[in-house]
Swiss-Prot record:
The lineage of its organism: Bacteria, Pseudomonadati, Pseudomonadota, Gammaproteobacteria, Enterobacterales. Its main location: cytoplasm. Homodecamer; pentamer of dimers. Binds only one seryl-tRNA(Sec) per dimer. Pathway: Aminoacyl-tRNA biosynthesis; selenocysteinyl-tRNA(Sec) biosynthesis; selenocysteinyl-tRNA(Sec) from L-seryl-tRNA(Sec) (bacterial route): step 1/1. This is L-seryl-tRNA(Sec) selenium transferase. Converts seryl-tRNA(Sec) to selenocysteinyl-tRNA(Sec) required for selenoprotein biosynthesis. Keywords: Cytoplasm, Protein biosynthesis, Pyridoxal phosphate, Selenium, Transferase.
Amino acid sequence: MTTEIRALYTRLPAIDRLLRDPAFSPLLAQHGHSQVVAQLRQMLDEAREQISQRQTLPDWSHDWQHACEQRLTAGQRSALRPVFNLTGTVLHTNLGRAIQAESAVEAVASAMRAPVTLEYDLDDAGRGHRDRAIADLLCQITGAEDACIVNNNAAAVLLMLAATASGREVVVSRGELVEIGGAFRIPDVMRQAGCQLHEVGTTNRTHAKDYRQAVNDNTALLMKVHTSNYSIEGFTKAVDEAELAAIGRELDVPVVADLGSGSLVDLSQYGLPKEPMPQEMIAAGVSLVSFSGDKLLGGPQAGIIVGKRALIAQLQSHPLKRALRADKMTLAALEATLRLYQHPEALREKLPTLRLLTRPAEEIRRLAERLQPDLAAHYADFAVSVAACQSQIGSGSLPVDRLPSAALTFTPHDGRGSRLEALAARWRALPCPVIGRIYDGRLWLDLRCLEDETRFMEMLLR
């Protein structure tokens, strides 16, 4: 070891001396002795490593208190950070899907602050059922006899199959054996539920006779799966829910449907493509219908099953129900969201998902044109332009449909793609990260989901 390197090691402070420094008192008070000591030990290890490898001290070594504070503060930052979702995907799975309505946020906060009547009946001072209040709401909205709530729609499908068809056959069209994100496949779910898959028809064409011919003494269910994340077009044929329900009644076999996204309102009245609605399935005679809470419904992550009272009772009494049940925060948010549907005239205003999906393209374009001059002046190395674009709903909902929108695009004057990557990384490192997408040599910020204009500009003009 040379004299110079030995001198560098001697400049490293002892942890005890640092802790006695008055500058560290606020850190000790805020983060505690253990965390501060652990952070200082890590910093000392880094400094020793740099001396060994590069024969220099780290740049931060002139102010140990400041460096330690920065690291501790960064370490305390929540893993679930608010971001600006300007990707063009409204219900972005990686960004948490539906934004909750204010009433849902307030309901969750209230449920977290105090004991609540989750499973307590105030009328007779006995044990109640956690799904009861929401089940009543869902029955009012959908016309179902009863309802069951679990923690997501994958769980809803699993419970529905396990409780009503374990050890028996479930008949499904080959064209509806879907896979959604995260490798959730209908055949795999059936296997986990203990069911036997009985495929009928072909990928593009399935007829009523295919279902009739498939039914046997071991048939438990006829199942309809909404292909929400893909579309088969051209020479096609499918049996709709009403016809399948009629076949089920004729052969005395229950019919169940997995809608995936599930919308409780007719989206076509807002100028959006129509999605199948649970109440339509119930009216058609389907025995059980499952759908998501955090997609088109605009609520928290939840799996909702509505349908016949006797079948719902089977689900509620199945051992899996306890493992899959929703907690009080989910139920509070879901109840508040469903109550918004009781006042449909105000739904578009109060439900963020519907508000964002129905936002007029011209309004978004005016927003982009208003922001463009200041951003163009600030980002001199880029051509900042307003461009028409197409948003998508996301989360497997209406996969082939697009929503006209407007974006701010950033194109480097020197044409170097590395500048786009660097700019995107810079925005992701902001206190409130800005998430866009790189496409066609430009960084796009689709403004459909931008509502806090002031905060957004504070971030980008830093």
